[in-house]
Structure formats: structure tokens, C-alpha cells
Amino acid sequence: MKTKTQLLLDIWAEARTRLQKQMDLISPEDLGKKLGESPNSIGFLLRHLADVELLFGKNVFGSPDIKVIAKTVIDKKDTGEWTELAALQRYVDEAGESLKEIIAQQKEEDWEKEIHTQEFGTKTLAEAFARIVSHTAYHTGQIAILQKYGHA
């Protein structure tokens, strides 16, 4: 029988496969794609997903090893600078690996402890964890739409 940690890690890994599959389809020319006057490009959203995964590992899971300058969160808008596909892929991969390692380190009792963040208040770690899963899925869906219908 799997532990809570193993089950939650499986859920996260399966949900994140949608992002990986989408990334496999992205070309350098896609990074600037937006829909009409929408504020975010594919490049920005990829950087944002990785920024937030790293912030999550640092602030929600309390990892002292993670160092992150979350430019997309700081700037709060697409500055047009996220145009290097290889660099974005590395950053997304590194963020995913960091978060995966942190999830795997959790003890069974950790999932029921309460944490508090400015973004979503007081939640159990398991409830907070659902936020990163849904955040990644939400923006991955946006990326898919931008890739299919967007214009640079």
C-alpha cells in the first residue's frame, strides 16, 4: 500500500505530464504567441510556472535550499524577455525536479499540518499542495490555447 506522500507525488507527476507534453510541442517561434490583447505570452507563462513551483517549494514546503528570483511574480506582467526556449526548458525542468524532491521528502504527518501563506491563508499542506497542481494545470491549458490559436 502506498503512503500519502507516494500517492500525492504520483498525482503531481501525472498532472505535470500535461505540461511536459505541451513543452515538447513548443518551438522558439511559439514563445511570443498571445491571444489578441491578452497580457501573457507562452514564454512568460513557462517562466511563471517554474517561478511559482520554486516559490512553492521554498515558501510552502519550507525548503531552505531553494533560491529563486521570481521575475514573473515580481514584475506582474509579461516584459517580453522570455524568448530563449532552451533556457526556459531547463528552468522548468529544474523547478519540477526541485519540487519533486521536496514532495518526496514529506513525512505522512506533514500533509495534515497547517501552514499559512499570504496568497491563500491557512491550509493543511495537502490542501495547499492542490494549489500547485491546479496552478500548473490552469496555465498549461492557457499555453495549449495560445500555441494553437495565438499569434506572435
Where are these regions (language model features)?
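Short, contiguous alpha-helical
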Residues: 5, 9-13, 20, 28-74, ...
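Generic structural signal for secondary-structure transition and capping sites
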Residues: 17, 28-31, 54, 97, ...
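Hydrophobic alpha-helical core bundles mediating ligand binding, dimerization, or RNAP-core interactions
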Residues: 12, 16, 23, 92, ...
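Acidic/histidine-rich alpha-helical segments that form the ligand environment
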Residues: 77-113, 127-132
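Basic/polar N-terminal segments that are highly enriched at the extreme N-terminus
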Residues: 1-3
